[in-house]
A protein has these predicted regions:
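Glycine- and aromatic-enriched mobile tails/lids
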Residues: 7, 20, 25-28, 32-37, ...
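Core beta-strand elements of the Rossmann-like FAD/NAD(P) dinucleotide-binding domain
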Residues: 34-36, 214-223, 425
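Rossmann-like flavin
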Residues: 102-146
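An anion/pyrophosphate-binding glycine-rich loop and adjacent beta-alpha core
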Residues: 251, 257-392, 463-466
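Conserved redox-cofactor binding core of oxidoreductases
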Residues: 128-215, 220, 227, 271-285
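Glycine-rich Rossmann-fold phosphate-binding loop(s) that bind the pyrophosphate
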Residues: 42-45
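Conserved N-terminal glycine-rich FAD pyrophosphate-binding loop of Rossmann-like flavoproteins
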Residues: 67-100, 266-270, 277-281
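Glycine-rich loop(s) and the adjacent beta-strand/alpha-helix scaffold that form part
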Residues: 223-278, 282, 440-463
Length: 648
């Protein structure tokens, strides 16, 4: 079935591809749009913007979220900003520079055409959000302000203090609410998609569980859009919201949609370190802090020991005895290297014994120099809410002492394979935002997730989905009484009944923690062949334990969070195995995927472009069967492929 990997990338010059492609897409006239139904799964920035835009175009949209309100989507937690090539700072930014730095940051493992389109529409996103009333930070004269993020040598990140995701989501939520009031969008809060329904090989609906009543419901449509985010919670401890999950995308994979580059997971360098065995999630400290914060560890082991024993404070260590290791190793970018580079550097220092907390798994993020240069008031203006959050969690005042940080799982670059139209290998099934694989390659640049979600939802999907729906408006509304719906619902009920009947000895959280330990130990920041094989073996054993000895309390026909978690863990166990399998197959180091066997003498990533310059798209072949690998070659016609260099 390799012929399914047709990317549909348009011919012609890079800068003209998207414009030319739009002109060649089929469209649906307003009268026919009213006959068509679209299901959108997820109400984060991608889902909310897509549902609002599609509703405004006149389609009948059903939008589903697992929370009480779309405002609870995890997009709201994004802190630092959103990238766009506006060149407001007059620092020589451009669409091409954003495109190039995104490709380079992803270690040359993403499609040129998709990334250029993302950079091309980025400016429109800012205009759209300003029109919605998003309160971006402004300079004294009223111009929108920018700051820098990792992997960029210009300032292109627009922000609303440390609450950018919240403000962008409120803008998208307002647009969504307007369409709900108009009647073009119907919202289904507290509903979780448990399966996608295919009729004649095309996506025609979903099976969902009402999380309040436990009722299993059927919903039909002419197309389905997956905007449910990534699968970072496979690791148990991550910066994601605790109910974030990859289940919707995973059900699509098991129905025939290919899953691409699952091993590409991003580990964020600035998170509050783990503090105990009973911790349920981790807290991100925005990358924006690296604009003014300097990362360091002591140079002397004796100072490290004294810090751990509480004999000295960080401020007692003299400037000449501090190792600002990112500034030392990467002088051209300093503390603003890409996330994968900064995370590995922190791990290297801690592995060498220079970690500064009692566990040895922390480094300092210090604002003393910035406070001396700018003053406390300016730092408070830029980062006040982030400093307040840090102090509440750690009881340490970051205005007076350095923050302690350590890398943690944050984002997944892998996801459902999609073509240039954002359609998966299943006709009528689309994936946007973090749910797809398309734009970030092996590593996402900071502030680009919000950019992709809104680009897909506002400015790409509303054009491309019409090309498919132009063939569907003559078809009647999907009959949810069709045998395919009956069969899908029956399978969902059987899975739930099986989980409820086990009555074993282990809670879902116990088993999820075990999975998280396996993933972090063997499929984390550093991977090797023996460890990945061990991970696959351990995950398979754990999956057997889960299906034979898990205990799911409560009633299936009612509100039951244990059942919700069990259904998601069943998927995480399978996702984790595919991640390990993909990482084992990809015998190179690129971006967030670091194989210890493939590194340079100074510990940097070492790609193998001859053998792995492709998207790895995996096809599900059945339970307990190995998936089949399909390859989409990556061609670079506008960028010269090179080893990433952030040193000069």
């Amino acid at each position: 079935m390799a012929e399914k990997l047709i990317s549909k990338i348009p011919e012609g010059p890079l800068s003209e591809k998207w414009t030319k492609h739009k002109s060649q897409l089929r469209v649906v006239n307003p009268g026919n749009k009213r006959k068509l139904e679209i299901i959108v799964i997820g109400t984060g920035l991608g889902g909310a913007s897509a549902a609002a835009s599609l509703g405004e175009l006149g389609y009948n949209v059903k939008v589903f979220c697992i929370s009480d309100s779309p405002r609870r989507a995890h997009s709201i937690a994004a802190q630092g900003g959103i990238n766009a090539a506006k060149n407001y700072q007059n620092d020589n930014d451009s669409v091409y520079r954003l495109f190039y730095e995104t490709i380079k940051g992803g270690d040359y493992r993403s499609r040129e055409a998709n990334v250029y389109r993302l950079a091309e529409v980025s400016g429109n996103i800012i205009d759209q959000c300003v029109a919605q009333g998003v309160p971006f930070a402004r300079e004294y004269g009223g111009m929108l302000a920018n700051r820098s993020f990792g992997g960029a040598q210009v300032s292109r990140t627009f922000y609303a203090r440390g609450q950018t995701g919240q403000q962008l989501l409120l803008g998208a939520y307002a647009a969504l609410n307007r369409q709900i009031a108009e009647g073009t969008v119907k919202s289904y809060p507290r509903h979780e998609m448990l399966d996608v329904v295919l009729i004649n090989g095309e996506a025609k609906g979903i099976i969902a569980r009402n999380l309040v009543t436990g009722e299993i419901e059927r919903f039909g449509a002419h197309a389905v859009v997956i905007a449910s985010g990534g699968y970072g919670n496979t690791y148990f401890l991550s910066t994601n919201a605790m109910n974030s999950n990859g289940s919707a995308a995973w059900q699509c994979y098991k129905k025939g949609a290919y899953f691409a580059n699952p091993c590409f997971a991003q580990i964020h360098p600035t998170c509050i370190p783990v503090h105990g065995d009973q911790q349920s999630k981790l807290t991100l400290m925005s990358e924006s802090l690296r604009n003014d914060g300097r990362i360091w560890v002591p140079k002397k082991m004796e100072d490290v020991k004294k810090l751990r024993n509480g004999e000295i404070k960080p401020n007692d260590i003299k400037e000449e005895d501090r190792d600002y290791y990112l500034e030392r190793r990467y002088p051209a970018f300093g503390n603003l290297v890409p996330r994968d580079v900064a995370s590995r550097a922190a791990k290297e220092r801690c592995d060498a014994g220079f970690g500064v907390n009692k566990t040895g798994l922390a480094v300092f993020l210090d604002f003393r120099t910035a406070i001396e240069r700018l003053g406390v008031d300016k730092i408070r203006e830029r980062y006040g809410n982030l400093f307040q959050m840090y102090q509440k969690i750690t009881d340490t005042d970051p205005y007076k002492e350095p923050m302690m940080i350590y890398p943690a799982i944050h984002y997944t670059m892998g996801g459902l394979w999609v073509d240039y139209n954002l359609q998966t290998t299943i006709p009528g099934l689309y994936a946007i935002g973090e749910a797809n694989f398309s734009d970030h390659g092996g590593n996402r640049l900071g502030a680009s997730a919000l950019m992709q979600g809104l680009a897909d939802g506002y400015f790409i999907l509303p054009y491309t989905i019409g090309d498919y729906l132009a063939t569907q408006f003559k078809n009647p509304k999907t009959d949810t009484g069709a045998p395919e719906f009956e069969e899908a619902e029956k399978a969902v009920r059987a899975k739930i009944d099986r989980l409820m009947s086990i009555k074993g000895h282990h809670t879902v959280d116990e088993l999820h923690k075990k999975l998280g330990h396996i993933m972090w130990e063997y499929v984390g920041m550093a991977r090797n062949e023996a460890g990945l094989k061990k991970a696959i073996e351990l995950i398979q054993e754990l999956r057997k334990e889960f299906w034979s000895d898990v205990y799911v309390a409560g009633d299936k026909d009612n509100f039951n969070q244990e059942l919700e978690k069990a259904l998601r863990l069943a998927d995480f166990l399978e996702i984790g195995e595919l991640m390990a399998r993909d990482a084992l197959h990809r015998k190179e180091s690129c971006g967030g995927h670091f194989r210890e066997e493939m590194q340079t003498e100074d510990g940097e990533t070492k790609r193998d472009d001859e053998h792995f310059m492709y998207v790895a798209a995996w096809e599900y072949k059945g339970a307990d069967k190995e998936p089949e690998l399909h390859k989409e070659p990556l061609l670079y016609e506008n960028i010269k492929i090179a080893t990433r260099n952030y040193k000069d």
